[in-house]
Amino acid sequence: MTIKEFQRRALNIQGVYLPDVLDILKEIFNVSSVDVIIDGDKELDSRSIEILDRLNKKEPSAYIIGHIQFAGMTIKVNPNVLIPRMETEELVLNLCETIDFSNKKILDLCCGSGCIGLSIAKRFPSSTVILSDISKEAINVAEENKRINDINNATFVVSDFLESIKDKFDYIISNPPYIPEGTKTETSYEPALALFSGMDGLDSYRKIINKLPFVLKEKGEVFFEIEDGKEDNLLSIVDRQGIYKGIIKKDLANKARFMYLKRKN
């Protein structure tokens, strides 16, 4: 199968877009975007058939490739972890630009691939970063990403939310499950454990917020990624808990995507 034919057939698959195809050609077949234009009749090896089959089965291109680029790092991904979204990268980059995490203790809760905590650890080598997830398989992926990116100031804990967390932190950052049970998702490949959180999608936030006084320092701060449209319900959860003040921030698409918590004065 030629490069040109692979591209044509891949783009005929619903949900597959040109950036996905170009990434696959580059990362798996070492074919650049220039090669696609000037050398489109070049033959690809037999993996091309297998990859088209996987795309037809709605497997995300990131899982086919096995890694993504995130905040300047290579992050390994597989079906044990969510594929980091650009909103998460936006959160990380904004935090790293506005907060000096040097010599601070940070928890990446529900860490998945580790993209959030490892990005902070990489940029602030004097920080102490703990990454936690209920899934040992996810922790294994995060540990591999620590090795790939040559990070020395990150450790890992298997924990059901905050149940096994004993330390107190200056900052807690979390992209927890927030999809209501029974919601149809774009792909069946991503782990349900990292997606779904009760009938309203907010159970994970309730569990975390109720235990924050035990793991957050007096002047500590919390940053959540949230689903647009749930901000009022989340602020109500924070208000009922009574200790913290919640502030909603919008992303670059002007959607309510982040919630920031700190103690009331």
Predicted regions and their residues:
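S-adenosylmethionine
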Residues: 126-128, 134-264
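SAM-dependent Rossmann-like transferase core, predominantly class I methyltransferases
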Residues: 50-124, 129-144, 254, 260
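Short, solvent-exposed loop/helix junctions and linker helices
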Residues: 15-18, 42-45, 82-86, 198-202, ...
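N-terminal auxiliary segments of SAM/dcSAM-dependent transferases
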Residues: 1-65
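Short, glycine- and charge-enriched coil/turn segments that flank and shape catalytic ligand pockets
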Residues: 41-46, 97-105, 126, 163-166, ...
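Short linear capping/connector segments at secondary-structure termini
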Residues: 37-41, 67-73, 190
